[in-house]
């Protein structure tokens, strides 16, 4: 993995992203999903995780956020953050690109037209100080 400066050392953002994807995979596997593929990359976008459950193919994008809850005594919502939701980063243009990547995956992998599929989003909140994460799955997002 290379960062913008062509160094082999991953950036902090890349490290958080990798931790988030690993947490998402662990969460999905514990909940009965079978990991089929990871990091399917095209020049127009990427699918972080492809899973299968109940004969349905699920394309999962992971958004990871590093948060510091060390001084927090009261959490006001389930995600631990009132002002920012990572899923807000899913802009219409990004969804359009994801749709194209999914279509590419279906063609590249010769997936039958009869196969049901959906797009899901996993948000991962990572507290590096406490070495904890919170994972949330948003299912069947319309592209």
Where are these regions (language model features)?
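Domain-level recognition of nuclease-like catalytic cores that cleave nucleotide substrates
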Residues: 107-143
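Positively charged, solvent-exposed patches that mediate nucleic-acid binding
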Residues: 52, 73, 80, 112-113, ...
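Hydrophobic recognition helices of helix-based DNA-binding modules
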Residues: 28, 105-106
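Conserved catalytic cores of phosphodiester-cleaving nucleases, focusing on short active-site segments
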Residues: 28, 47-71, 79, 98
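Short acidic/glycine-enriched loop/turn segments that link adjacent beta-strands
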Residues: 42-45
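Mg2+/Mn2+-dependent nuclease catalytic core
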Residues: 67-102, 108
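Acidic-basic catalytic patches of nuclease active cores, encompassing PD-(D/E)XK
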Residues: 1-38
